[in-house]
Amino acid sequence: RAAMKVLEAAGHRVYAPRGLCCGRTFLSAGMVDKARKEARKMVQALAPFAGKPVVGLEPSCLFSLRDEFPAMGVGELSGALLFEEFLARNPGKLEFRQMKQDVLLHGHCHQKAFDAMPAVEKVLGMVMG
């Protein structure tokens, strides 16, 4: 909900479908058919929004949309972005109150593996000044 509030404050309209799963947990457990079924459901549910960005919070799930879906043959969601990737590219009307303090950043392993940390650093820089 907090991420939705930030996106709305930036001037973006947000649609958050419920009950969708990327299938990543099934894929990790070797249940490819179940993963493919969940992925197809997600692609079908998001089809009316083709061309719009799909913004996600969880790196493992989000990278499944970008990388695993095409490999499973269920479609492609190439416009899928992590929340911080989207904000780094589309800050919209957001005005950050500058904070002057030290922060320790520990990135998600998938963010590191897929070189997604620069977006986190950029958004933190918008806040930290």
Predicted regions and their residues:
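Iron-sulfur cluster-binding electron-transfer modules in prokaryotic oxidoreductases
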Residues: 1-129
